[in-house]
Amino acid sequence: MKREDEKINVWGARVHNLKNIDVEIPRGSLTVITGLSGSGKSSLAFDTIFAEGQRRYIETFSAYARNFLGGLERPDVDKITGLSPVISIEQKTTNKNPRSTVGTTTEIYDFLRLLYARAGTAYSYVTGEKMVKYTEEEVINMILTAYSGKRIFILAPLVRNRKGHYRELFENMRKKGYLYVRVDEEIKEIASGMKLDRYKNHNIEVVIDKLQVRDKDDERLRKSVETAMRQGDGLMMIMDKDSGEAKYYSKRLMCPTSGIAYGDPAPNKFSFNSPEGACPRCKGLGVVNLVDQSKIIPDDSLSIYEGGIVPLGKYKNQMIFWQVGSLLEENELSLKTPIKDLPEDVLNDILYGKIEKVKIRKEVVHTSSDYFVEYDGLVKYIQQAIEDESNKEAQKWAEQFLTECKCPECHGGRLNRESLSYKLWNKNISEVADLDIKDLDQWLTDAEAHLDSKNKRIAEEILKEIRSRIHFILDVGLDYLSLNRQSVSLSGGESQRIRLATQIGSQLVNVLYILDEPSIGLHQRDNEKLIKSLKDLRDMGNTVIVVEHDRDMMLNADYIVDIGPGAGRKGGKVVFQGTPKQMLKQDTVTSEYLNGRREIQLPDHRRVGNGKSLCIHGASGNNLKNVDVEFPLGKLIVVTGVSGSGKSTLVNETLQPILSKHFYRSLKEPMPYESIEGIENIDKVVNVDQSPIGRTPRSNPATYTGVFSDIRSLFVNLPEAKIRGYKPGRFSFNVKGGRCEACGGNGYKTIEMNFLPDVMVPCEVCHGKRYNRETLEVRYKGKSIADVLDMTVNQAVEFFENVPDILRKIKTIQDVGLGYIKLGQPSTTLSGGECQRMKLATELSKRDTGKTMFILDEPTTGLHFEDIRILMSVLQKLVDRGNTVVIIEHNLDVIKLADYIIDMGPEGGRGGGQVMAVGTPEEVAESGKGFTSRFIKEELERVR
């Protein structure tokens, strides 16, 4: 019999739809929690076990500290025992900060900064020479050797290439007793009131001494060098009096030719989040927003009068048009001249302004007069609007004319030129951070071999830390990422695996880890590595709980908890808990898919499509290798390939933005491509993702699908409503009139509990029904509007069977497998998979033209085998209507149902970006090209 502390026991869990369940999970195991979408998996793993672990941790804080923290709410559970400290690793890409990168998240970049600060070699950003550094004694010996017997000036640099009159500086030097300065390579006596041209750049050195170099024991030389170093902040200059040649010497890192000096390198110098290291132009972001001429003039066949310059619009009797008109008249042109016929210099004057003032003629009652005004150009006007923080409306207007470009100063390196001048084995830190992780691993090996013995000793421990973290990232299948990759650009699965690698690297023990589908976005090729990583985490002495649907993950687990049997109200029970071996003998939905008794069937035939296609030529964004890709229309298309092979770049970053820009004038710019053909063969594009369908509890399936408007119209037309003169707004809980004013139509009240979490209690007036008594008195078939919102979709289908407009919309919700959810259920409680299917239901309810392209990125995220079967049947219906569905997917249950596959590869990152194979699943399987073909072949053989 197991001891109590060898397992995690959950008694009486009732969070969301959980039916007072008891669960036992062995400690030190890899446990998979599985079940249909909406069955209660996340409610058990995250909202019960993790929430209680988090609450216990926060309870250790003082009451004062708890006042500033959320997350104290106790989950609805009787008791949980055996909990360790809990760490949750979810799919959500929570970090939207553009400064967060793979390198900063994994802490590899922190160690890399330390490596460059301790072992990097500095080079001059002016000449490219290696920087030098001397002690005072070495400087004196070098002067004695180089200038023996010569007369020299000893100078201290004060100003380097800066504007100003410097009157105060000269006066200060004069008061200190100095008689001469060298200004712009000319020795001058410091006169009272001396000043320079304030608008020119100047170099100023103060003359510390002039002497003849004699022997070693020259005390005067020694003291003068010491003073010069002090006045010049570690930098000094020696000038030969006869030849006028000058040479720099420094106690700091210095360029022997130009004299520029660097401070001693510290790790902060290599941080783009620190003022010491960040590029001054882009502030460490690597990109800047610049005004894009193609957005200002999208159609140069139009004239300015016709609105050819978008920021100006069509002609108006305003000063800006008078100024532009005068510019054109000077060149014998007019506002009605097509922009393409304007000379380049005239167009530049209009966009960027003119140095000379513009002459404007003002005519008043048969008399005219000329006056001159300054004209700064449209681009400057747009830039001023962007910089004006006080006028958000003008900022938003100006943003449409900007394009994000690489910073022209650091060229995307994020750091200032001094920081980018430190190198290790011919690469600066930004170049190293741009390498794929697998290339970085090789570079570290090569760099270490080229270090001298002193630096090798210094770098040994740092390299060890970097390497261990790199290997953890390689183990979770992310070898194609670079350290400079922004966290915000990672998919949910990538983001989660990065955090997983970071946790493995932290070497914590006796911790409970809870992960949400770590296999999402991972090709079958890399699945084994991920499972090994999770087992390594377990073998360190941790307990790992994974919410997962992946077949291999379940079969490799130590323990499985299956929640079901259905979803929503029909779920929330433990249908099985035990080992995978025991699971295969059960008759649950999950076990039947695992042991092959139930299967997602292959289609009888592959569609031939409508004979038309959409072709992208020369796609070269990110790692795409100038590829030409054809999307045959009227088919179910699946884009496959290993992680990082270019699938998302092709579909989400190239295809979708092209279509969105064409149909909806989207501001998102597509990745580079040469041309697109066949766009006339479709009439719209719809992206069906798993993002929430509403951000507040007021949003619900009825409002999202639009069926609530029809339901309110039905109630308005009832005799009782007509007698009372009710309008549709009477049946809305969002506006005054029909809603309960005591709770504002929420159905509950929030009670603030100071340092305890806020408590939500049902409204004592409407008892959670949201409406006032008078509104609830209007009934249809004995049900009030509140009763209708409390119905499940299945109940509503029966209830409204005689109302075609309402039935059509709610029937599609039922058809996508969401019959169990309530019409008035808050959108915030729906899972990602449920949100996605809700969006599909909305599209299905529309009367489409059969020329729509639907785009889905990994729609199987969070979906059980049975959910995938339902989802795919919905997508097949969309294609049967003549539409085209494009899916990015790794799941073989989806891939095998495709009419057409586009397989990207062969590897991820720089090794990818090519089209490996296209055609039906059978054709791709037989091609033998790419990694996907082998897995498709095995899957087709398994199901036949």
Regions found by a protein language model. Give the residues of each.
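Conserved phosphate-binding elements of NTP-dependent enzyme cores
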Residues: 1-944
